[in-house]
Amino acid sequence: GDLPVCGETCFGGTCNTPGCVCAWPVCTR
């Protein structure tokens, strides 16, 4: 299956997308 795409803006070090981590200011895998 396809993995979720990371890239949302993150605040407080948390990302809503599973498997993504906050690399301020955006989420990345």
Curated annotation (Swiss-Prot):
Domain of life from the UniProt record: Eukaryota
Disulphide-bridged cysteine pairs: C6-C20, C10-C22, C15-C27
Keywords: Disulfide bond, Knottin, Plant defense
BP term (GO), one: defense response
Matches recorded under SUPFAM superfamilies: Cyclotides
Cross-link type Cyclopeptide (Gly-Arg), residue numbers: G1-R29
PTM notes: This is a cyclic peptide.
Its job: Probably participates in a plant defense mechanism.
Protein family (similarity comment): Belongs to the cyclotide family. Moebius subfamily.
Domain notes: The presence of a 'disulfide through disulfide knot' structurally defines this protein as a knottin.
Protein name: Cyclotide psyleio C
